[in-house]
């Protein structure tokens, strides 16, 4: 890929947007607005009873409360695992002894340069959550059957939660 030009159009503390012009390896010219993001860590926390911890919060773009795996963005210079440990403690109050990477993926590669990494977190101890000032988070433990019913019924619609749950069923149990 050959980048011809990149012009930053917008920037805040979460992401930036640039207009880019490039030529792909086959010679095809591409012009696109790209959302740049440091990446996110997603935590699939499983307790000794094989229940999975989900958080519920209002998601403005979806105009709805969503049940989802806890997650958060990587701070500058932070690894996905460091972010996962920090975010799990902040959002849920939980700490994990054991961490295993389940998968890394691009949630929307057509225009967003964000990578998400999902970690399995086990050996949990519970504490007090310390969410950010702009976060209102409810937590609840779900059985695998409850999550499957939630996905099938359309009550769980978050993509990272579905991907994490499916990957856990494949390799994490």
Regions found by a protein language model. Give the residues of each.
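A glycine-rich, hydrophobic loop/mini-helix early in the fold
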Residues: 40-64, 68
């Amino acid at each position: 890929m050959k980048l011809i030009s990149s012009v930053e159009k917008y920037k805040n503390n979460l992401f930036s947007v640039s207009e880019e012009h490039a030529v792909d390896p086959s010679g095809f010219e591409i012009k696109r607005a790209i959302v740049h993001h440091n990446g996110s860590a997603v935590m699939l926390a499983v307790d000794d009873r094989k229940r999975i911890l989900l958080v519920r919060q209002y998601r403005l773009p979806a105009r709805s409360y969503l049940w989802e795996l806890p997650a958060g963005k990587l701070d500058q210079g932070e690894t996905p695992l460091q972010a996962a440990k920090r975010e799990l403690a902040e959002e849920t109050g939980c700490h994990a002894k054991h961490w295993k990477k389940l998968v890394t993926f691009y949630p929307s590669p057509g225009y967003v340069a964000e990578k998400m990494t999902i970690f399995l977190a086990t050996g949990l101890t519970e504490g007090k959550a310390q969410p950010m000032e702009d976060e209102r988070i409810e937590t609840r433990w779900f059985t695998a059957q409850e999550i499957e019913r939630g996905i099938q019924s359309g009550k769980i619609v978050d993509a990272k939660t579905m991907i994490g749950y499916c990957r856990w069923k494949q390799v994490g149990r």
